[in-house]
Amino acid sequence: MYDLNYVKPKSTNDAVSEYQKSSEGQYLAGGMTLIPTLKSRLSSSDLLIDLSETSISGVTISGKTLNIKAMTTHSEVANSSDVKKSIPSICDLAGQIGDHMVRNRGTIGGSVANNDPSACYPSAILGLNATIKTNIREINADDFFVGLFETSLDEGELITEFSIPIP
């Protein structure tokens, strides 16, 4: 892994500000893909922006919409009573991801932002016609996923929440 700096901002605005100051900054959600990629020198960064202190975690229901914030861990999704009563298949999906260590650290936002073709969330987000909310816009799932490991996120754009219509 290359030498790099590390910050832990308290808000998404501060996280985006830190990103804009760096030449090769990367957001750190759960780190399940990013850290091994950096350690293997398949990617480099001059700054890791740890999102764990931001307030973008949790699950709510608003009318006929399930809202899952980006830093919600797989375990939190799997054990959420709101998810269980609205879209139980997402609980099942989240409860099958990796092992308990991955489920306790990995996040829905990191998984979707990475768009690994072997990941579970991207196909669920697409199939459920979710809306991906970022710090600057809302993107329909059909427009979000561009290709393998590719999304329509702009440079420095940060996923904050997923809004999923309850069937």
Predicted regions and their residues:
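C-terminal structural segment of proteins
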Residues: M1-P167
